[in-house]
């Protein structure tokens, strides 16, 4: 993924 802040932090693994 890589849409929200978590996406950018975890390389897009946690898209919420």
From Swiss-Prot:
It comes from the Eukaryota. Nacreous layer of shell. This is Uncharacterized protein IMPP19. The lineage of its organism: Eukaryota, Metazoa, Spiralia, Lophotrochozoa, Mollusca.
């Amino acid at each position: 993924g890589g849409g929200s802040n978590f996406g950018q932090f975890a390389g897009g693994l946690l898209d919420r």
